[in-house]
Amino acid sequence: MQIPEKYLSSVDNVEEETQILFALSKQKDADLGMLDSKQEQIALTIGNKPIKVKQSLQSLHQSRGSTGSVLWKTSVKVVPWLLQQSWFMNSLTPKTSILELGSGISGLAGILLSPFVGNYVASDKQLYLKKIRENLDQNNASDVEVHELDWKSTPYPKDWTFDFLDYVLFFDCIYNPHLNAHLVSCLASLAERYPGMQCLFAQELRDQETLVDFLERVRPYFEVDLIKMEEINKTSVASSTNLPPANMSLFIMKPYNHEEYMLKALNEAKKCEPTDSAFCVGAVIVQNGKIVSTGYSRERPGNTHAEECAIEKFMLKNPTDSLEGAIMYSTMEPCSKRLSKKVSCTDLIVKQKFSTVVLGSLEPDIFVKCEGVDLLKKAGIVVIEKLTFQDDCLREAVRGHPPKH
């Protein structure tokens, strides 16, 4: 999905940027975002397509947390707008695969989008699946697959029939702070399996703290951009009346390519002079999707460590800039204690307020016992262990050490 850069705003400072969104969103929704919470069946026309949606008001009123039992305004407003955007429609082909999370009972997005793609999967909790199927079938969308996908359990349907995934969609799914961690875990698992996928999500702006919490949790795994719908509409042939209301926002997310950056860190480690008294480690710092610094063990004068070198090089080049929210890639767990009594790399990372540390391997207890991972997590930093690189990283780390007998 190629969106012109001028229509994207990178979400770097979550607090500040969500505050602006909510300040501009003056429209209050008395019905909490539901299209109509009083009718068992809703009839609407989108484009030239008549659609009927059966709701389950009994489930909504009797079952706690049954928010998927009704049709929500966000999908009604945002999906038709997307259908009018060339950058969106040009990305849909007969080979495109889409997974929708938290589809809810209506199946509306699948009804509207499935004619343009090869595979569309609507997913939600087990209790909604039968009703989703009914709504899809009565609206001639029987080709849409329906699968159980509970964010708290399996990250993807076990009986899913295709091997690749282009897009993940979800509409108005960020409403309960207790579910944010599960949603992010699900998204991270999907990104691990399908690193080329992109996520598109629309959200009604109801609770700023809940949205901030979600964005802070998801940013270690994804680059997040706000799509400027109002700016797009200024240059679009579509009528401005089709613009979703100001209290709805649309975001696009792309998984960080952890493998690519870890390979670059491994290449940094290969630059180290071998020694039997220290490790050979490489580090790469990524900020806003770009490499801003690199380092390797003993690159700078003194017994300097890779992470230390990368941070020092950045600060020397950008003395007024901050590394807050950046991602540190290191071929080995950052040190928590140094025999030289210098500040540990773990402390440096915490001080600079990195959001995430991605590791190629844990540190062997050869010189000192390392507690870097525990200390980073205790400081609120996300730690991602890419242990598929462990053998290569450890082999490089002990280059110069005497062979074990």
From Swiss-Prot:
Cellular component, GO, one term: mitochondrion
Active site per the UniProt annotation: 307 (proton donor)
UniProt catalytic activity: 2,5-diamino-6-hydroxy-4-(5-phosphoribosylamino)-pyrimidine + H2O + H(+) = 5-amino-6-(5-phospho-D-ribosylamino)uracil + NH4(+)
Domain of life: Eukaryota
Keywords: Cytoplasm, Hydrolase, Metal-binding, Nucleus, Riboflavin biosynthesis, Zinc
Annotated cofactor note: Binds 1 zinc ion.
GO biological process terms, semicolon-separated: nucleobase-containing compound metabolic process; riboflavin biosynthetic process
Gene3D superfamilies listed in its UniProt record: Cytidine Deaminase, domain 2, Vaccinia Virus protein VP39
Record bears the keyword Metal-binding: yes
E.C. numbers: 3.5.4.26
Keyword Hydrolase: yes
InterPro entries referenced in this protein's UniProt entry, alphabetically: CMP_dCMP_dom, Cytidine_deaminase-like, Methyltransf_16, SAM-dependent_MTases_sf
Record SUPFAM superfamilies: Cytidine deaminase-like (SSF53927), S-adenosyl-L-methionine-dependent methyltransferases (SSF53335)
Sites where the protein binds Zn(2+): 305, 335, 345
Domain (CMP/dCMP-type deaminase): residue spans on this chain: 256-383
Family: Belongs to the cytidine and deoxycytidylate deaminase family.
Role of this protein: Involved in riboflavin biosynthesis. Converts 2,5-diamino-6-(ribosylamino)-4(3H)-pyrimidinone 5'-phosphate into 5-amino-6-(ribosylamino)-2,4(1H,3H)-pyrimidinedione 5'-phosphate.
Full protein name: Diaminohydroxyphosphoribosylamino-pyrimidine deaminase
UniProt source species: Schizosaccharomyces pombe (strain 972 / ATCC 24843)
Originating gene: rib2
